[in-house]
Amino acid sequence: MALHALTFLTTCITAVTVVTASSSTQLPFKPLPDLFSLTVDDIITGFSTNQFTSADLVSAYIARTAEVQLALRPVIEINPDALLIAQTLDNERLIQNRTRGPLHGVPVLLKDNIGTADQLNTTAGSYALYGSIVPHDSTVAANLRAAGAVILGKAGLSEWAFWRGTNNSNGWSARGGQVKGAYYDNQDPSGSSGGSAVAAGLGLTALAVGTDTGGSVIDPANINGVVGIRPSTGLTSRAVVVPITVVQDSVGPITRTVKDAAYLLSAMAGPKGDPGDNYTNAIPFTTIPNYASYCIPSGLQGAKIGIPRNIFPAPVNYTESDIQQIDAFNAILPLLASLGANVTDNADYPDIDAYNTEAQFTLALDIGFKHDFPAYMSQLKFNPTGIEDLADLLNWTQTFRAEQYPLRSTDFWENSLACNLTTDSPDYLAAIAHNAYLGSNATIQGALDAYGLDALVLPTAYSVRPAVFAGYPVITVPLGYFNATTTVVQAGGGGDPAVWGLNTVAPGIPFGLSFIGPRFGEAQIIQFAYAFEQATMIRYQNLPLAKYMPVTQLHTPVAQAEFECPDALGLPK
């Protein structure tokens, strides 16, 4: 376990040898792919034609991360063994002529709340977990290793997946500092998986993984111009993942393309009946689907798609942001029809009034975290802070300077501790059951059934919240960008301006389109999203700001990368 401070970037990329594609047996005249747009299929081709190796990829990704880390902080920590693992996988493929799985040699960046039993820390961005040792790999990490992936490192995130307090900013953590997006200066990365989305979008990794309790995969993917999938709750195991609540937590892919997300989801998912997560018992198949096989250009042919417009705000309340996103959405509806979809407009949610007035989002998280956090802590092999429960965590956080209390609040935890309900309380169980109704028959399932639909489609900003209550899958794919005359809007919640103030709406910032399907209907919504993506390729119509675009490529000769670690996290001296 790496216990030294600021361990991101292999001890901040101090004297890391970067092996470039020139070290491989490269076929002549074959151009190397750009890492900004590199796909898993490109990697498979590059490996099979000896254009480059896994070690080449890892080295280039580390160098690219070093180029943007000070400005954007998308990565908390690089796996100090990543290059060695990549070289081992290269040897297996090239010398032993064997592969471990479909992602053999492909680098993957994990959000820093996903447990790994290696030299990486798993901290949810907090020093409260720094140096802790998990009992074993999370099921997701173990699945990825079995598929042959290289765990490249840990991505920045909103501390505790933004379950700490209202006066905080998306993407900030004590360990990682402030993650920022790359499409506008001081861009809000959204959260809580902002680091994963920024890293995927800039080509700092082949693939990235986030977690989603209330939109934390979908929202960052939406605002950073990438693809995100919030899987059905239970399709991906939460074993050895720092929790908020098992009722809503999900672990999902964040990638540059739909097909890459499909590859990643197949590798991550399951198994059915994982002993570390009983929600996996609900998986309706014994073999995880090959989701990439559903990525066909004609995937919308005959699809029955509905638009539940009553989830939108009343037109009189539209903001400039609403207008641009809904206008862009309306503009692509003829395209969906031309691709063969049968689009039913105004396929509205049947009990939208109940959803709007009766949802108890915070109660589920208040009680869930108070219960599930101690369970996570109890399984650690080493717990250097001695924190056992939420009361301990609150007291520790309020006294450790790097956690920036009281500038950054802890009121979520205070409210949770003040609530006398437990996960066995009838009032809590009733609230969870009602939330499940509000996310299913009152909204998503109700509309699917009433109109005989395969899926729903919405601008991403309006798509995810009902789904989290009942565990429905959502995929987001780029739809557009705010135009050049857009008024800049800053995040705000009445808190300290030193904490708030990131730009959430601004010229050039992306926004997405979401498909929502029935429980465990990932295959169909992946199929629909892929067909839309291939017909539009909107991700490449606007690029991040040039100053935030890494320049290192596979062909870039870099002998060594020297990177000075800034003391920007407020560590005690």
Language model region names:
Residues 31, 104-125, 299-313, 363-439, ...:
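Short helix-loop capping/hinge segments that flank enzyme active sites or metal/cofactor-binding pockets
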Residues 48-49, 62-70, 87-94, 145-146, ...:
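Sec-exported extracytoplasmic/periplasmic mature domains
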Residues 55, 89-107, 260-262, 294-308, ...:
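Immediate post-signal peptide segment of exported/extracytoplasmic ligand-binding proteins
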Residues 67, 201-314, 330, 335, ...:
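Structural helix-boundary/capping segments
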